[in-house]
């Protein structure tokens, strides 16, 4: 019997043909080459139901785009941080120990508040 505990990658560009989509799919392919199942999705959807349904996940990689943290649009920054905080909270409520990684540009990591960074297992720099 084979147990499958995939890594979930959440990126709005996962299926896009732009540079971001190509980059996240390259990461996905590299993980799969190591023998780990990867499931790519394009949005968080309903946060609580997604976290509950994905109880078999072994880890989450959450992609954050630099555009979401454009300092000229503080409302967008606040919204992106709120959504990220809520999703991580739902994951931690379901499983306090599941590894969570952020994937994004190095400069984007500067905008992530410390309370979110403490919940992460790492930041994958693109």
Put a short name on every predicted segment:
Residues 40-42, 77, 101-126:
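Output/docking surface of receiver
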Residues 60, 84-114:
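A short, hydrophobic beta-strand element within the central beta-sheet of small alpha/beta folds
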Residues 1-37:
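Non-catalytic signal-transmission and effector/linker regions of two-component phosphorelay proteins
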Residues 9-13, 60-70:
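Short loop/turn segments at strand-loop or loop-helix junctions that form parts
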Residues 14-22, 68-82:
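Short, flexible/disordered intra-domain loops and linkers
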């Amino acid at each position: 019997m084979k147990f499958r505990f995939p890594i979930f990658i959440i990126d709005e560009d996962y299926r896009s043909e732009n540079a971001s989509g190509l980059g996240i799919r390259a990461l996905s392919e590299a993980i799969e080459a190591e023998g780990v199942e990867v499931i790519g999705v394009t949005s968080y959807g309903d946060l609580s139901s997604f976290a509950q349904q994905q109880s078999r996940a072994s880890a989450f990689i959450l992609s954050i785009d630099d555009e979401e943290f454009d300092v000229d649009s503080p409302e967008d920054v606040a919204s992106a941080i709120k959504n990220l905080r809520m999703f991580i909270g739902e994951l931690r409520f379901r499983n306090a120990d599941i590894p969570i990684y952020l994937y994004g540009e190095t400069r984007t990591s500067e905008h992530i508040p410390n309370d979110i960074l403490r919940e992460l297992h790492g930041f994958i720099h693109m």
